[in-house]
Swiss-Prot record:
Top-level taxon of the source organism: Eukaryota
Biased composition (Polar residues): 369-415, 533-554
Alphabetical GO biological process terms: actin cortical patch assembly; actin filament organization; regulation of clathrin-dependent endocytosis; signaling
UniProt GO cellular component terms: actin cortical patch; cytoplasm
The organism of origin for this protein: Schizosaccharomyces pombe (strain 972 / ATCC 24843) (Fission yeast)
Protein name (database record): Protein kinase domain-containing protein ppk38
Domain notes: The protein kinase domain is predicted to be catalytically inactive.
Keywords: Nucleotide-binding
Pfam families in the record: Pkinase
Residue ranges constituting the Protein kinase domain according to the UniProt record: 33-315
InterPro entries given in the database record: Kinase-like_dom_sf, Prot_kinase_dom, Ser/Thr_kinase_AS
């Protein structure tokens, strides 16, 4: 192996580009290599079956892996994979490593030749495809689980430990029938501490996305902002997913996605049937938090107990369920309290575990015992304040989390059985009485608000039994003021019922309408004598009188113009509008001058007589306003927008 940190010292590659032809020979370290056939292709590699010749030994078959590194970072990753394979090469449950060579193809491109053990029986995924009709038995599953767990234990037992990070069915090979080996150590690394800054979290997410498969990712890989590190417990979770797929040929979170992984939401199918003990083993491995999962020794012991075979590895954990980066037992409480106040967490619910239910202890005494749980979550207390007793949480087709741990909680964290945890707080602050707020002005009734809205600027004077409003009346005409002052009060209430705003409004309207009839009645017109045509003066448009609205060729009497001129007061009260709305009506009528209004004539009256418009009642006026038939927005500009719709339709 010519591994070196200085890439410029690497020899230039003499290998042909593309696929290596059959019979091609080269030298890798002390082995003479001859290509026999092409096997497979990876993302940046080609795999060949070759024959090795070593001095003093008979030829044997091996695998040549030709890896292409497109930059220095990729070359460094290949270096790490080769070093990992050297560490685990002598173990019978891992694929053996024979040698490697590094070459330089250009300034920034490299290629590496790696010799590995050849497994003639293919991969585990190929073996599962041959058993689609007849599924694996429980003993076959336990044999595969035992070999893979032993291979992972070899990595976890190193100092410092290595984590595989990409445990899956595709990375298990069959060296011989009923003999399985773990391969593909390109994703292996040492334990990674939890991210403390946003930059560290972003880098950790990038590594997880690059070196792991999402179906086998643990919850702390999905959400790195929780602050949990990536250590041996991530491999424990991946083993649980792998065992589940051996049973049911699918991963537990295949269809639900990443959210199901975060919530540990999955179910056990009813077919094929397996023992409750095997399902409890899978459930123990698939725990939400790292400290809830067993270590690799506890997992291997349980599998050996189920297979009824001796345990041939020793316990380096001394009976403790610990890991490199994540706390266990009571240490988790202190760890969670620190993470709660850090800037990485998004919410309190992302720190503390979900309410969990208890699980029956497994047969192996080395696995976590639920009777010594480190603490009880809020969901473990019933409504009566008593803690729920440990019951079996397993049932077909369902899954709930359990809280396994071998660590005992310190006395200051223990919860008294039979009563929920109590907290001591200081005396509550005295309750300050709310100050009473008295309104500066009384609330107005609905009718009063309507009157105020329809008035111009000030509140309209309404005759009542109370004192008459004596505000500013300078804007009123003298005639209007006399009408209002001489208006009789509605004191004669024959019915004896209380007068309302509507009754007072009706009385006022009827009274003013009768006065308007007298004031608007035209003077007696003498018979026209010595009629002659008089042109209508053009400068007379400023006075909106009926005479100015007549045709210029119409014959009128000399004294008729003065008699037919209606004073502004009568115009303001033309429809019974009184009070301060008179000034508004005058302004509106002034804008109607340019467009003549249709006169109401009596067929029996003499020519030139003008019949005053019939006053409109409140009911008719309100109906017109509610049905919006009074005026509508015209399609023309100018003064035509004020055209009466009813007259236009005629």
């Amino acid at each position: 192996m010519n591994e070196t940190n200085n890439t410029s010292l690497l020899p230039v590659s003499s290998l042909p580009s593309g696929l290596l032809p059959v019979g091609f020979s080269c030298t890798v370290e002390k082995f003479s290599v001859t290509v026999k056939r092409y096997l497979a292709e990876g993302g940046f590699s080609h795999v060949y079956l070759v024959q090795l010749v070593f001095p003093g030994k008979p030829p044997f078959e091996a695998v040549l892996k030709r890896i292409f590194a497109t930059d220095a970072m990729a070359l460094r990753a290949v270096h790490e994979e080769v070093r990992t394979m050297k560490l685990v090469s002598n173990q019978k449950r891992c694929v053996s490593y024979y040698g490697s060579e590094f070459f330089r193809t250009s300034k920034n491109q490299f290629e590496v030749l790696v010799l590995l053990e050849y497994c003639p029986c293919g991969g585990l995924i190929d073996f599962l495809n041959t058993r689609l009709q007849v599924r694996l038995s429980e003993q076959e599953i336990l044999k595969i689980a035992s070999d893979v767990t032993e291979a992972v234990a070899v990595m976890h037992y190193l100092k410092p430990p290595l984590i595989h990070r990409d445990l899956k069915i595709e990375n298990v090979l069959l060296a011989a029938p009923n003999s399985y080996k773990l391969c593909d150590f390109g994703s292996a690394c040492h334990p990674i501490p939890g991210a403390k800054t946003a930059a560290e979290a972003k880098q950790l997410e990038y590594d997880i996305e690059k070196f792991t498969t999402w179906q086998y990712r643990c919850p702390e890989m999905i959400n790195v902002h929780k602050g949990f590190g990536i250590d041996e417990k991530s491999d424990i979770w991946a083993l649980g997913v792998l065992f589940y797929k051996l049973c049911y040929y699918t991963t537990p979170f295949e269809h639900q996605g990443l959210a199901a992984i975060m919530n540990v939401s999955y179910a056990f199918p009813t077919f094929p049937p397996y023992s409750d003990r095997l399902k409890r083993l899978i459930s123990t491995l698939l725990q939400q938090y790292p400290w809830q999962r067993p270590n690799i020794y506890q997992t291997f012991c349980e599998i050996c107990k189920m297979r009824n075979v001796p345990i041939h590895i020793y316990d380096i954990y001394n009976g403790k369920n610990v890991s490199s980066c994540n706390p266990s037992g009571s240490e988790y409480l202190q760890h969670a309290s620190k993470l709660e106040n850090s800037g990485i967490h998004q919410s309190k619910s992302s720190v503390f575990p979900q309410p969990a239910s208890a699980m029956k202890p497994m047969a192996s005494p080395m696995l976590p015992n639920v009777n010594s749980m480190p603490y009880l979550s809020n969901g473990d207390h019933n409504n009566n304040g008593n803690t729920s007793s440990p019951v079996s949480r397993f049932s077909y087709g369902q899954h709930t989390s359990n809280v396994p741990s071998t660590q005992k909680l310190p006395s200051n964290f223990r919860v008294t059985q039979g009563a929920p945890p109590s907290h001591t707080y200081g005396p509550p602050p005295p309750v300050q009485p709310k100050p009473k707020i008295s309104p500066t002005t009384p609330r107005l009734s609905t009718l009063a608000l309507a009157d105020d809205m329809f008035s111009s600027t000030a509140k309209e004077t309404v005759p009542t039994n109370e004192a008459v409003f004596t505000g500013d009346v300078k804007s009123f005409d003298s005639q209007e003021s006399n009408i209002i002052e001489s208006e009789p009060l509605s004191a004669s209430n024959a019915s004896g019922k209380p007068r309302t705003s509507v009754n007072r409004l009706v009385d006022r309207y009827n009274h003013t309408s009768s006065l308007n009839k007298v004031a608007a009645a035209p003077a007696p017109v003498p018979k026209p004598v010595n009629l002659k045509s008089v042109e209508n003066p053009q400068n007379n448009i400023s006075a909106p009188t009926p005479s100015s609205l007549q045709s210029s060729n119409a014959p009128v009497g000399l004294g008729e113009v003065e008699s037919k001129s209606v004073p502004p007061t009568n115009m303001a009260t033309e429809r019974g509008v009184v009070g301060r709305r008179a000034s508004m009506s005058i302004a509106v009528n002034a804008r109607r001058v340019s467009k003549p209004e249709k006169e109401h004539t009596n067929p029996n009256a003499e020519q030139g007589d003008v019949i005053p418009e019939k006053p409109m009642s409140i009911k008719e006026r309100m109906n017109m306003l509610m049905t919006k038939t009074d005026y509508e927005k015209p399609k023309v500009e100018g003064y035509g927008r004020y055209t009466d719709v009813q007259q236009t339709k005629k």
